[in-house]
Regions:
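Extended, highly charged
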Residues: 1-168
Length: 168
């Protein structure tokens, strides 16, 4: 059972969520070089298809990523960090499992207006590549998207993206 309360968590972004996973012992950090095309997902699938009980599953944070062409990435990849098991999901939703349905219904029925921030004050900005710039490795291949089924998928795909939002 996750031991922090909603008031204690109060984290504002994915970095803080990762810190909470680490503090709760729900994160396995892989710092050795991992090939995103051949090694990343088989390692993660091992825990789901290898007979590990759900409560013993962990999130994986890969920090030293390469691909089959030798390209190195400076972006870490978190896999299973939002819903690897019920404890991880509960931690991210910031509510008890028994309250998940009510929490989702409340969030869907009570959307909040976006908080518009002046571009100069924004903590992050879009980086947009168009036209010929996409041919120089700045398209989807600039992001270390793993290949889900090595040997079967011919490229990385965004098949089930997650969105990080904040519920006031």
């Amino acid at each position: 059972m996750v031991e922090t309360t909603l008031e204690e968590r109060g984290y504002t972004d994915l970095h803080e969520h990762i810190e909470e996973l680490r503090a709760q012992g729900l994160l396995i950090e892989i710092d050795r070089e991992i090939n995103k095309d051949t090694e990343m997902h088989p390692l993660v699938r091992w825990q789901f298809r290898g007979g590990i009980d759900e409560e013993d599953r962990k999130a994986f944070l890969f920090t030293n990523i390469t691909d089959s062409k030798g390209r190195k990435y400076d972006i870490p990849v978190l896999v299973g960090g939002l819903a690897g098991n019920q404890q991880i999901y509960q931690l991210g939703m910031r509510c008890d499992l028994k309250d998940l349905k009510t929490t989702w219904i409340n969030a869907i029925n009570n959307p909040i207006e976006p908080n518009v921030v002046d571009s100069a004050d924004a903590p992050c900005h879009d980086v947009v590549f168009e036209g010929e710039d996409l041919l120089n490795g700045n398209g989807l291949d600039a992001i270390p998207v793993p290949i889900s089924s090595p040997g079967w998928d011919n490229a990385p795909y965004f098949s089930s993206s997650h969105f990080i939002t904040k519920d006031p």
